[in-house]
Amino acid sequence: SVRNFVKILESAGVTYGVLSNEQCSGDPANKLGDKLTYQLLMDQNVEELNKVKNVTTMCPHCVVNLQKEYKKYHEIKYEVKHHTQVISELLEEGRININPGSLEKVTYHDPCNLSRTLDEVSAPRNAIKAAAPEFFELDESGKETLCCGAGGALWWKKDSGEGRTHLLRAEQVIESKTDTVVTGCNFCYGMMNQGIGPLTPAGQEEIKVKDVADIVAENLS
């Protein structure tokens, strides 16, 4: 996914750099109650990121923290965008061209932080629809999306698996008869893969899980 996002940026002629001293945003530590670790990571990140003007990340959790949470404690001098917003802008500006070559049925799982916390539901759809004419919505979508099961640091909580949210969402995706499910969050990407694999009936082809950057990069013209 990261390589495909880089492919998109380079296709558009975007000048970019990668942080040499990148740290986690601290979101998992914060959600798990480790406020000291969160504070340390936040302080380091703000010092580093205030040296630049524009920041792009592929993780909605990171956007929420870098853009919203850090402002409660620091003066923020940079602007943060989710990678789907960048891709959508590049499309609108005509800086990338997409050949809608995917004839598969494609649906989209809205990440909670992107759709509800950041109020972003259009950008990923603009990008997906440009590449996949056979796009359709899941029953619970947009701001009414069903959590993938990794939110609130639950990615690190292990249990028997019975009744877990990611299995409920995976069942919905499988029942939709889609060929591919696309998302815009690394946590959602992982949970989709964990849920869909075990629940796919024997003899049925497993639904592919992709990031928005993947489906766009695959169809660049």
Task: Locate predicted features.
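Iron-sulfur cluster-binding electron-transfer modules in prokaryotic oxidoreductases
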Residues: S1-S221
